[in-house]
Amino acid sequence: MSKYLVVGLGNPGLEYEKTKHNVGFMCIDELLKEHTLFLNNSKFNGQFVKVDQPEDQIFIAKPMTYMNNSGEFVYEICKFYKIHEQNILVIYDDIDTDVGKIRVKAKGSSGGQNGIKSIISKMNTEKIKRIRIGIGKPVHNLTHHVLTKFSAEDSIKVQQAIIKAKDACNEFLNHVDFDKIMNKFNV
């Protein structure tokens, strides 16, 4: 039986809800809603749902560690359930991608994003599949930028990007070749 983990990054708490840093959480919410699933497990300082299918076991999750320590949750759930690194897909915000765009990658460095940096460090590999959802470059302060909400205009673009990211997650979970997923969504 193959095991897969789709994890969206963000910060827990109402004060961070709908902020730019939480687009990974928002994507997970869309994925859960589409499949009528709920995060019904709390373990490893995170929340997740485990879905048993005939040939696969799927985990959809949100770390509750705060962004910068996301690797702790990912490492612990993967170790406990024996999820291989090639079966992990991480969704997170990216300041180097325009608002409303997504970038799908099979591996690479963190690009300075602390959540994926933590995961790369704890898992000891850059071979982590990921979907970066664009939040645009900050005008001034980076921390202020990622912890603020989107403008009304940008909210529409971001919601469309979240839907695309959710669709890419579904293709990953349906065993579509990852190169095909990248070619389809990196337009």
Curated annotation (Swiss-Prot):
Keywords, sorted A to Z: Cytoplasm, Hydrolase, RNA-binding, tRNA-binding
A GO cellular component entry from the record: cytoplasm
Binding site for tRNA: 16, 66, 68, 114
GO biological process, one term: protein quality control for misfolded or incompletely synthesized proteins
Catalytic reaction equation(s): an N-acyl-L-alpha-aminoacyl-tRNA + H2O = an N-acyl-L-amino acid + a tRNA + H(+)
CDD domains in the record: PTH
Catalytic class of the enzyme: hydrolase
Keyword Acyltransferase annotated: no
GO MF annotations, alphabetized: peptidyl-tRNA hydrolase activity; tRNA binding
EC number(s) reported in the record: 3.1.1.29
Residues annotated as site: Discriminates between blocked and unblocked aminoacyl-tRNA: 11
Residues the UniProt record annotates as site (Stabilizes the basic form of H active site to accept a proton): 93
Pfam name, any one: Pept_tRNA_hydro
Compartment annotation: Cytoplasm
Keyword Manganese: no
Active site (UniProt): 21
InterPro entries named among the record's database cross-references: Pept_tRNA_hydro, Pept_tRNA_hydro_CS, Pept_tRNA_hydro_sf
Known function: Hydrolyzes ribosome-free peptidyl-tRNAs (with 1 or more amino acids incorporated), which drop off the ribosome during protein synthesis, or as a result of ribosome stalling.
Oligomeric form and interacting partners: Monomer.
PANTHER family: PEPTIDYL-TRNA HYDROLASE
Family: Belongs to the PTH family.
Protein name: Peptidyl-tRNA hydrolase
Organism field: Malacoplasma penetrans (strain HF-2)
